[in-house]
């Protein structure tokens, strides 16, 4: 076992043995943001004496315990929003994803994944544990973008159950589901140089989302990918967002970027946190050394995230029109908060924005211009910018290296 594997295993062991839920004590008077919605500190949290049905906490084993109110409690409205975000995690016992033979294909796998593929999953991968975290983070980003379109930004867990179940079925762990891990791996092998059992980086994940959305044939959502730069070209975006009749269609912007070498350079901190405050935000995938997460919120210098590194049984395949059970849908949600200081994040990430209409696009452009600190996004008018436009983009962030 190499030092990277040992270090990764050590971190996971520590997390399982000591995994306290964060308290609202780092920036208790600062606003909390969750995908563009602002929540103010709950001044009355410490006066509650009667627990409500949501006054619980989830531990790492998945069990739920009563959470005693305290002066460091989180605003209830924020927790309701957080637990309504769709949370994709590792799954096991799904139909096998065929292995690709060859020494060069297994060289980039971790030791644990190689051993599992040789001793357990000999006919193919029946779990993405140990290698699918970036795919799951990307699925989370896409699922929440679709949720905002189909269910609305104000939708909360438990409402419109049938529609949520139908949305989740798009991500079922079967070869036929439009956004399954099987489809991600298939396109990754065909077009991105990523093979079963290998980590995906932000760039490969973005390209898979773009391709699978197109293959799905659903006109609900278009996808614009920045091609490993921090630049967004207005002419290219409009070509994608407008249909043949010129009408604007909801479009997901995916920006793969790297904001530093080993950590995020401090000059980018404000720009990164601001991205989660935009009403167009659908979160950030990546951003954790050797372990991708899905970031959905921020408070002060900390970011809140959903962790895909929990393995659950794959849901059984459903016939068309058949719904998941409440218990099955509940595995896609958690009330368990996790946070990280921005200085501890990995600089390689995939940032997502959902542009619903022309007015949304104009608002997003204004917000990009108003961000404090060094910009993490540059908007240019044309794919082939002239000299003046290039001069305005000299202060660009580093291009994405698709290595986790």
UniProtKB/Swiss-Prot annotation:
Pfam families: Peptidase_C54 (PF03416)
Gene Ontology MF term list: cysteine-type endopeptidase activity; protein-phosphatidylethanolamide deconjugating activity
Active site: 133 (nucleophile), 307, 309
Top class in the EC scheme: hydrolase
Transmembrane parts of this sequence: none
Coiled-coil regions listed: none
Catalyzed reactions per annotation: [protein]-C-terminal L-amino acid-glycyl-phosphatidylethanolamide + H2O = [protein]-C-terminal L-amino acid-glycine + a 1,2-diacyl-sn-glycero-3-phosphoethanolamine
GO cellular component, one term: cytosol
Chief localization: cytoplasm
UniProt keyword annotations, A-Z: Autophagy, Cytoplasm, Hydrolase, Nucleus, Protease, Protein transport, Thiol protease, Transport
EC number(s) on file: 3.4.22.-
Classification via InterPro entries: Papain-like_cys_pep_sf, Peptidase_C54, Peptidase_C54_cat
Localization: Cytoplasm; Nucleus; Preautophagosomal structure
GO BP terms in the entry: aggrephagy; autophagosome assembly; mitophagy; piecemeal microautophagy of the nucleus; protein processing; protein targeting to membrane; protein transport
Family: Belongs to the peptidase C54 family.
Function: Cysteine protease that plays a key role in cytoplasm to vacuole transport (Cvt) and autophagy by mediating both proteolytic activation and delipidation of ATG8. Required for selective autophagic degradation of the nucleus (nucleophagy) as well as for mitophagy which contributes to regulate mitochondrial quantity and quality by eliminating the mitochondria to a basal level to fulfill cellular energy requirements and preventing excess ROS production. The protease activity is required for proteolytic activation of ATG8: cleaves the C-terminal amino acid of ATG8 to reveal a C-terminal glycine.
Protein's name according to its UniProt entry: Probable cysteine protease atg4
Lineage: Eukaryota, Fungi, Dikarya, Ascomycota, Pezizomycotina
Gene it is expressed from: atg4
